[in-house]
Amino acid sequence: MMFLFVSLFMFIFKWQRLIFILISLEFLMLSLFLKFSYLLSEMMFFYFMCFSVISSILGMVVMVGNMKFFGSDNCIF
């Protein structure tokens, strides 16, 4: 529940920077991962785990792509 709280507030109040959006989505994925680990069957848990890894990798690709092509990542300062 704490990860859900942190991710929602970070997503609401720090939406201007890409890195904070990606971090809040990772916290949201972690909260769902912890919640669904007790509720889902083994196969659905495996699908959800694969989805969370793929979304993490795609988030990093988006951030690196923005820094490469646009020059300013607009995420640190």
Swiss-Prot record:
Keywords: Electron transport, Membrane, Mitochondrion, NAD, Respiratory chain, Translocase, Transmembrane, Transmembrane helix, Transport, Ubiquinone. Its EC number is 7.1.1.2. It is a multi-pass membrane protein. One of its GO terms (cellular component) is mitochondrial membrane. The chain crosses the membrane at residues 18-38, 44-64. GO terms for molecular function: NADH dehydrogenase (ubiquinone) activity. It catalyses: a ubiquinone + NADH + 5 H(+)(in) = a ubiquinol + NAD(+) + 4 H(+)(out). Its main location: mitochondrion. It is found in: Mitochondrion membrane. It comes from the Eukaryota. Core subunit of the mitochondrial membrane respiratory chain NADH dehydrogenase (Complex I) that is believed to belong to the minimal assembly required for catalysis. Complex I functions in the transfer of electrons from NADH to the respiratory chain. The immediate electron acceptor for the enzyme is believed to be ubiquinone. Belongs to the complex I subunit 4L family. This is NADH-ubiquinone oxidoreductase chain 4L. The lineage of its organism: Eukaryota, Metazoa, Ecdysozoa, Nematoda, Chromadorea. The gene is nd4l.
